[in-house]
């Protein structure tokens, strides 16, 4: 069976950040790594899909601007024209992930899965959540069931729709919820 082709687009955020020690959970450097670093830290990705990395931005999500959203939209819309690409994962900071997801949900012109993911702990933390979140996001973007569902947010094993998701906690790995509807699903595996 042919593996799906997934493009992982890096925009920065905690998922590619680094601290000075494994115990540092705050005050870390956002400029530490890029999306290729986190991909290489998760070799199981190659078992699920053929991966292309696209480091598009490297910013803290609190600094994202309309021009960045437009760049992301144009990039995905252009890449989505390629029939060999099955879906997209966007690594993103959690501060504005829900806003980016909502904007993309309104502006993208593709039925292909688009999944935003990130982390609450830097890549260098003892129990970094980014690698598993990335793995689960690729699993979701590779799923035929995710096609046509709009932009999705996946962290901590949960799947949320862009229209309903909210960040409700600034320190816990269980940071996102969909208060009015609940999660669309869970990733188990």
What are these regions (language model features)?
Residues 1-189:
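Active-site histidine-anchored catalytic micro-motif
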């Amino acid at each position: 069976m042919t593996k799906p082709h997934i493009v992982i687009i890096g925009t920065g955020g905690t998922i590619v950040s680094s601290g000075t020690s494994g115990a540092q959970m705050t005050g870390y450097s956002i400029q530490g790594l890029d999306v290729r670093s986190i991909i290489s830290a998760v070799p199981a990705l190659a078992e699920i899909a053929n991966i292309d990395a696209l480091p598009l931005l490297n910013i803290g999500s609190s600094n994202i601007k309309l021009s960045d959203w437009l760049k992301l939209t144009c990039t995905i819309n252009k890449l989505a024209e390629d029939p060999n690409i099955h879906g997209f994962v966007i690594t993103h900071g959690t501060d504005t992930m829900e806003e980016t997801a909502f904007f993309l949900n309104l502006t993208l012109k593709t039925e292909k899965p688009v999944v935003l993911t990130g982390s609450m702990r830097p890549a260098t933390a003892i129990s970094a959540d980014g690698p598993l979140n990335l793995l689960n996001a690729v699993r979701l973007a590779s799923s035929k069931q995710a096609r046509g569902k709009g932009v999705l947010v996946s962290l901590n094993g949960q799947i949320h729709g862009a229209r309903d998701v909210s960040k409700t906690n600034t320190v816990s790995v269980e940071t996102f919820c969909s208060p009015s509807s609940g999660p669309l699903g869970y990733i188990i595996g």
